From Swiss-Prot:
EC number: 2.7.2.11, 1.2.1.41
Species for this entry: Mesembryanthemum crystallinum (Common ice plant)
Family: In the N-terminal section; belongs to the glutamate 5-kinase family.
Gene this protein is translated from: P5CS
Name of this protein: Delta-1-pyrroline-5-carboxylate synthase
Control of this protein's activity: Feedback regulated by proline.
Length: 719
């Protein structure tokens, strides 16, 4: 739960207002899918004991659509050529309200929920006795678990444009919802719109940023409103006025998108959805917003200073970090042991504890990988291509850093070291967010690494994010963060991809396969299969599925593999063909799409290499897959047709690793089908730019310029 939304745990009575742009489609017809999703969410809240009040718009738009259609079917061709008179809104409201409420009644009844309609006008609220009776009626309906559905009775309203009148009662359904929230003593008001929330500019402008928490003193003068919605009366301006009115009266308000199918549930769960208006927001939001943005900006500034130093100086920084890791081994291991003990006490899964643990060999290996990285060819400013555009006009394509990276990872503190060293080698700024289970390990490693960075670059080159609540704010900073790399569970990767406009690089699963062909050397096959599964079962490149040619089930080869795996303590789950062979006594698997991350794997029999390829391409995660075969034609078929980031022949899947591939280290393994695929080292953290060197040439309509477009040899790099 986001810290700014912690108050929702005490919410019981909720007013939900849904706007015309959400209730209707672009053609004016009612949006059945969105309304169905809305009703399902309200049903869920009702079943969980919440008291839900719905304020709805859409009657005028729905009625206008019906009347236009009726007029169209009853018009002659000559009538259609005449200027069309806009239909009266009050008549539209009278026609549309009936159909709108009938739809709500149908949808709620399908969910075993009852709705009640209440129509009000602004004049009604001038009468204190009306307010009292309205409150009593709504309370009675809530006690009966009925959903009150309120709307302004536009058909008989005496108010005319401009709708915001001096009486200050209400002038649209946003202000009506705010008024009702106060009258009915609601704990929360949710205003559903056709955009994700309040932006500091028009939502269509890519430079506009979503404001997660509105602070009047900060944002009032910064916001530029765009056009109002296509059908509604007030647009975002009206929503903000209504939200400020309710919030400062003590009722929290959240403006969120009504087009998402689960935003109401997310709001109630305390997720950072939409824009929050809260009377106490000015006390706690500014420090947090400033902190994460300043951290990202500082990382960018430090990265530019890092790029400005010489290649030898960057190399020395890495060597100093490697030395510092070894010099501080005892401190690092002491903090790591505390994390491991806490994780075991908390009952964390064994695979997570295994990834969390460090030892002297791991620290030595990390230091070694950093030194290998330091000795690699300078990656920044490499000339990748030279072209003579015209006489005296030379174009160069050069490598350069991406900018600022945000890495979100779980449980593995050694990942922090690898990522930090790669960021420094590639000239990038870095923000790191590790899992809470490795909090102490990450803190000491971050301190050791940043202490080795010279002042001329600045230790803010690498920032450590310590609060989970800051992640949603970081994911909104697409103007200062250039790439997000999540390393962890499928759930983590998926959540991040859904929550940001920043490019995301990574893999969600590591469902790696080993296929043993009938031509395989079985002694080799046993070694590779055991290594792929047992060397480090929690690794993302560990074998999760063993596929075996059908002939090996008949000649004893499969039995030997199963015996060896059992001897090493591996639990096996069989596919349908294994399950049919009772002699192996293997429990049937429920799915082939499972990453165990533990001493367990799936085993299945396939007819041939083509069946193995089809299985891998269908059930795999495009990570790492291996064939064991002596038949080179079969092996080449496998290597060419398996669509994975790394494909191996007669070698363990555990070799798919940045250090083992000679990359020095890896920031992660990407299964995305982009430039960076497989283990991502320094090159995956670089982009390119064009440098054009001329001698006074101008385009001038391409007159006087003779284009040659001649490839030129690359020149030696400057250090």
């Amino acid at each position: 739960m986001d810290a700014t939304r912690a108050f929702v745990k005490d919410v019981k009575r909720v007013v939900v207002k849904v706007g015309t742009a959400v209730v209707t489609r672009s053609d004016g017809r009612l949006a059945l899918g969105r309304l169905g999703s809305l009703c399902e969410q309200l049903k869920e809240l009702n079943s969980d004991g919440y008291e839900v009040i719905l304020v709805t718009s859409g009657a005028v738009s729905a009625g206008r659509q019906r009347l236009r259609f009726r007029k169209l079917v009853n018009s002659s061709f000559a009538d259609l050529q005449k200027p069309q008179v806009e239909l009266d809104g009050k008549a539209c409201a009278a026609v549309g309200q009936n159909g709108l409420m009938a739809l709500y009644d149908t949808l709620f009844s399908q969910l075993d929920l009852t709705a009640a309609q209440l129509l009000v006008t602004d004049n009604d609220f001038r009468d204190p006795s009306f307010r009292t009776q309205l409150t009593e009626t709504v309370y009675q309906l809530l006690d009966l678990k009925v959903v009150p559905v309120l709307n302004e009775n536009d058909a008989v309203s005496t108010r005319k444009a401009p709708y915001e009148d001096s009486s200050g009662i209400f002038w649209d359904n946003d202000s009506l919802a705010a008024l009702l929230a106060l009258e009915l003593k609601a704990d929360l008001l949710i205003l559903l719109s056709d955009v994700d929330g309040l932006y500091n500019g028009p939502p269509s402008d890519p430079r506009s940023k979503l404001i997660s928490t509105y602070v009047k003193e900060k944002h009032q003068g910064e916001i530029t409103f765009g056009d109002k919605s296509r059908l509604g009366r007030g647009g975002m301006t009206a929503k903000v006025k209504a939200a400020v009115y309710a919030a400062y009266a003590g009722i929290p308000v959240i403006i969120a998108s009504g087009k998402a199918t689960d935003n109401i549930i997310k709001v109630i769960d305390g997720q950072c959805v939409g824009t929050l208006f809260h009377k106490d927001a000015h006390l706690w939001v500014q420090v947090k917003e400033t902190g994460v943005r300043d951290m990202a900006v500082a990382a960018r500034e430090s990265s530019r200073r890092l790029q400005a130093v010489s290649s030898e100086e960057r190399k020395k920084i890495l060597l100093d970090i490697a030395d510092a890791l070894e010099a501080n081994e005892e401190k690092i291991l002491a903090e790591n042991e505390a994390d491991v003990a806490a994780a075991q006490y908390a009952g964390y899964d064994r695979s997570l504890v295994a990834r969390l643990a460090m030892n002297p060999d791991k620290i030595s290996s990390l230091a070694k990988s950093i030194r290998v990285l330091a000795d690699m060819e300078e990656p920044i400013g490499r000339i990748l291509k030279r072209t003579e555009i015209a006489d005296g006009l030379i174009l160069e394509k050069t490598s350069c850093p991406l900018g600022v990276l945000l890495i979100v990872f779980e449980s593995r503190p050694d990942a922090l070291v690898q990522i930090a060293s790669l960021a420094i080698r590639s000239g990038n700024g870095l923000l790191l967010k590790g899992g809470k289970e490795a909090k102490r390990s990450n803190a000491i490693l971050h301190k050791v690494i940043t202490s080795a960075i010279p002042d001329k670059v600045g230790e803010k080159l690498i920032g450590l994010v310590t609060s989970r609540d800051e992640i949603p704010d970081l994911l909104k900073l697409d103007d200062v963060i250039d790439l997000v790399i999540p390393r962890g569970s499928n759930k983590l990767v998926s959540q991040i991809k859904e929550s940001t406009r920043i490019p995301v690089l990574g893999h969600a699963d590591g469902i790696c396969h080993v296929y043993v062909d009938k031509s395989a050397n079985m002694d080799m096959a046993k070694r590779i299969v055991l290594d792929a599964k047992t060397d480090y079962p929690a690794a993302c490149n560990a074998m999760e599925t063993l596929l075996v040619h059908k002939d090996l089930a008949e000649n004893g080869g499969l039995n030997d593999l199963i015996v060896d795996l059992r001897t090493e303590g591996v639990t096996m789950f069989g596919g349908p063909r294994i399950d049919a062979l009772q002699e192996f006594n293997i429990q049937a698997t429920q799915t082939f799409n499972r990453e165990y991350s533990s001493p367990a794997c799936t085993v299945e029999i396939v007819d041939d290499v083509y069946a193995a390829i089809e299985h891998i391409n269908h059930h795999g995660s495009a990570h790492t897959d291996c064939i064991i075969a002596e038949d080179h034609k079969v092996a080449e078929t496998f290597l060419q047709l398996v669509d994975s980031a790394a494909v191996l022949h007669n070698a363990s899947t555990r070799f798919c690793d940045g250090f083992r591939f000679g990359l020095g280290a890896e920031v992660g393994i990407s299964t995305s089908r982009i430039h960076a695929r497989g283990p991502v080292g320094v090159e995956g953290l670089l982009t390119t730019r064009w440098v054009l060197k001329g001698s006074g040439q101008v385009v001038h309509g391409d007159k006087g310029v003779v284009y040659t477009h001649k490839d030129l040899p690359l020149v030696a790099q400057n250090s």
